[in-house]
């Protein structure tokens, strides 16, 4: 094993339930994230040689510093990963380790689930490697505990090899990325770097500086309930209004029909009765004009329906969540060019594609710190079929070390 503690560190992290809670109003959204930061990560950061390790209870970030040991390396580089996991069972994570994978089906514990290369052809990219999977009852949490483990392992390597020269390094582990609010309270003044990287990507080589622009849409439908036996010309069914609204959106502009640079409308929740219904959507696009046009479209649909109904029964609430960080990063591509150069020197082919999602870097970039995203290794994230390759994680550690030594 290239880095002795990487696997054990990762296994230790994923066994801690740090699932975030979208309905919480606290920061972090769950107590387990703060406990993870204070009882596991903070002591370990101090033990491996990070300095000024401190936890900010206001924003939930745990930050540490490794000062440069060569004054000619003047850049300051940050590395960021998130502590929370996605909206899937994270209690009693029991990882499986598959050594020397040879393309077979992988039975997930004693569950009835398996990782089948026919269903998941990405498995064929990992022949001969060590895979870490779930037992079929939980997610794994490689998103983003692989990133945390990689950053920690890189720091440990550097402090154990003081002859290796590196620049100033800042490390930040934050909360609630999966529910879209993790970076809302991020303190730039507490993270003085020239640029940073989130270690939150997927397969080997991913290097990303384009994200969706994102908005949350809540639509409330106000009906009028009367006895169905005498409902003619009187009843207004709020659930039917919700159906009508949804059908006015472009049918092919949904996640299941889009890829690449295509945006979408995604219905994530629908609840209600005849009297009142509520639909929750997320809106995503890459280009600013297209993003704004999508928001205008839903407003226009609501206005048209209200005009037809003769009163305001379709109420729209739109909230922007984050924006495409390309707008910031393309002004100075130093972080991207450096990462490309380091990867190529390590014989890793950079895979530069848009993220069909967002990272904490989306918001942090607009706060003044360009923060692209680098691969951390996770595959099939956010569910029971999640897995990660140990060899990909090792290569991510290589990249982190390469970046700070080349700065």
Curated annotation (Swiss-Prot):
Zn(2+) 1 binds at residues 82, 143, 200. Its EC number is 3.4.11.4. HAMAP family: Aminopeptidase_M20. Keywords: Aminopeptidase, Cytoplasm, Hydrolase, Metal-binding, Metalloprotease, Protease, Zinc. GO terms for biological process: peptide catabolic process; proteolysis. Its cofactor is Zn(2+). Disulfide bonds: none annotated. Zn(2+) 2 binds at residues 143, 178, 382. Belongs to the peptidase M20B family. CDD domains: M20_peptT. Binds 2 Zn(2+) ions per subunit. NCBIfam families: peptidase-T, PRK05469.1, PRK13381.1. The gene is pepT. GO terms for cellular component: cytosol. It holds the Pfam family M20_dimer. The keyword Zinc applies. It comes from Streptococcus pyogenes serotype M6 (strain ATCC BAA-946 / MGAS10394). This is Peptidase T. Transmembrane segments: none annotated.
